[in-house]
């Protein structure tokens, strides 16, 4: 059995996981600390046929901090971002970016420096991480990352203005693979909360699927997306109970709240070597059953291997502790009912 697994490399209470990957490398220790809120790191990890936990190593991409001079021009609204033109006190207004007003950080997902210090405002010397629309991922993070295994991401605040940390692109958000979506057949909306990664790892980036509606799932290309110490990473979502709003559910929750990092299920999505892997696992922070059922099904004409469903509080696919499917062609759907 192959199944997604959580890899925790520092004390934390959120779960980080990804899909099966094709070739093994070195192993890592897994640990959970429910009552602490530290930084989190993730890698692509799986359990092979011999029950050996493995990770896949790959070369990390190189990014540099722009040295563009600031000017007095206004924020661009055509999807491109110009360094040194937007004040750190202003949240950018470009295509794809989403303001998270309920967090109290001026719209940012998190604000951190290299020493893991945090701030409630984007200010000099800090990395200001941001959310993108469903089906998109942020493009900005520095190639130099903290040596202790934590991560930072977003735009950099310098001399009162914002600068890209990846000058290879002027788009702050990029469209992910289109091989998965969520369909909600219930009447209440369902808030799927993606982790802010690289960054705080808090589950604050919302994909809200209204009753009778659908939304894309961010399937990141693990071969080109952020890599932690040379290891591939994927997207992860905490799935709140139906009826919980983004403002109430896409937060760092508290014990017994059943929201945020205490939500009942975790969803993983990633693509590597041309194959998409989609997973569902129970959140080890929660022992409460979800108030919905969910299954992963193939879209018309798709080639999907494996089965995965969560019904009446139990998994009915490839394993009792979660399940994974691989999409060889076409796309798959997380159907909530």
From Swiss-Prot:
Biased composition (Low complexity): 57-67
Family membership noted in the UniProt record: Belongs to the SUN family.
Cell compartment(s), UniProt: Mitochondrion
Disulfide bonds: none
Cellular component terms per the entry's GO annotation: cell surface; fungal-type cell wall; fungal-type vacuole; mitochondrion
Keyword line: Mitochondrion, Transit peptide
This protein's name: Beta-glucosidase-like protein NCA3, mitochondrial
Protein's job: Involved in the mitochondrial expression of subunits 6 and 8 of the F0-F1 ATP synthase.
Protein's organism: Saccharomyces cerevisiae (strain ATCC 204508 / S288c) (Baker's yeast)
Domain of life the protein comes from: Eukaryota
